[in-house]
Amino acid sequence: MAYEDSIYFKKPWLKSYEPGVPAAIDYEEIAMPDILDRTAAKWPDKAALIFQGYSVTYRQMKDMVDRFAACLTDFGVKQGEAVAILLPNMIPQVIAYYATLRIGAVTVLNNPLYSDRELEHQFNDSGSKVLVTLDLLGNRMIDLRPRTKVKQIVYTSIGDYLPFPKSLL
């Protein structure tokens, strides 16, 4: 099917727009880490991330992203290379994602529920040499690593981002 015949070309949803609503908007082309920088400068003490009652401000988030980006660079990750992230939706996942983008690398987000076979394929297909994951998955990733291109595993803990007394669990 030619693009001109596709529903995306015809845009039938535009008929449902209220009068005065534009069919397209102008937007600034800006990278996500640059948006973070801008937001951290404008609202440094506002909450950027909240996880299970633990809050991180934009200033703190920017600092964490910058420090982890430096860590990835120290590991030898270069622009265009892949970094595998195997984390649930939690603060370290966001930090790893932004840090990877900060250095111009490619994020390879993986589902913690993937089987070892699926993860092996994801890591090898992407060429990821660095993996960011939970300490709870440590033994599993150590066993999987020899079958992949992963050279460095970075562990994070859910407990590091929980308020007291949950952080003791």
Q: Where does each model-flagged region fall?
A:
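Flexible, non-catalytic linker and terminal segments flanking ANL/adenylate-forming cores
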Residues: 1-29
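Conserved AMP-binding/adenylate-forming core of the ANL superfamily
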Residues: 26-28, 33, 37, 45-90, ...
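Structural core segment of the AMP-binding/adenylate-forming
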Residues: 1, 75, 102-169
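Charged/polar positions on well-ordered alpha helices
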Residues: 41-42, 63, 102, 109
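Ligand-binding pocket scaffold of soluble enzyme catalytic domains
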Residues: 13, 28, 38, 101, ...
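Short low-complexity stretches enriched in small and charged residues
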Residues: 2-9, 85-88, 107-113
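A short, compositionally biased
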Residues: 2, 40-45
